Amino acid sequence: MARAKLKFRLHRTAIVLICLALLVLLMQGASYFSLSHQLARSEQVEELAQTLAKQVAFSLSPIMDSGDDNIDSQKVDAILQQLTQSSRILDASVYQIDGTLVASAGENVKVRDRLALDGKRPGSYFNHQIVEMIAGNSGPSGFLRMTLDTHVLATESKQVDNTTNLLRLMILVALAVGIILARTLLQGRRSRWQQSPYLLTANIPVKEEDESEDDTPEALVGQAETDHKPADK
């Protein structure tokens, strides 16, 4: 009896541990889902920024293809100012094919500091550099460089955390509903699985569904014989 009781406890403990492990995996899966969604969104933003750089380079192509002495730097500066005004683009610069700076707009930060080549700007890993060639009639006429701010704002980070917490809460609510339904539907009932040799109730017979004794064949036959008996005089 003691050995069977010990086996039953070990069996129940193993089931509980497996359920807890699955619950932890579901929680981590919710975090992974939110993180993958955030990474996919970052890739989408990078693709959109690359498309924007190509469009700006296409707009600068007629200006840059007019020759080194005839480049209208004011038009280039106006385009860059419009590009960097109240946006995630921190700065933008246009260079000639030999590296000469034509115009720049945005934050007044040196390229070496922006790229953290000297290690003086620890927050530069939140910046993403985009370089796009400006095509001309006879070949490249210059280059466009943009600095994209990839830092996640506090509101965006909080939104991701709220999504993760909501998924975890839904998992816990589903678990609680399952436990309540199981206890409500199985409370006071014993089924065939309780005849398992690992349970202490293995030797106790299982009662069948509640049936009225009047519905048994013997009761029906007895009732029929009673109905056919002659009445006592």
Curated annotation (Swiss-Prot):
Membrane topology label: Single-pass membrane protein
Thylakoid among keywords? no
Question: Which residues fall in a compositionally biased region of kind Acidic residues?
Answer: 208-217
InterPro entries to which the protein is assigned, alphabetical: Uncharacterised_Smp
Annotated region (Disordered) at 204-233
The region annotated as signal peptide is: 1-33
Tell me the domain of life: Bacteria
Its transmembrane ranges are 166-186
Localization annotation:
Cell membrane
Query: Mind listing the UniProt keywords for this protein, alphabetically?
Result: Cell membrane, Membrane, Signal, Transmembrane, Transmembrane helix
Q: Name one GO cellular component term.
A: plasma membrane
The record's similarity note reads: Belongs to the Smp family.
Name of protein: Protein Smp
- Record the organism: Yersinia pestis
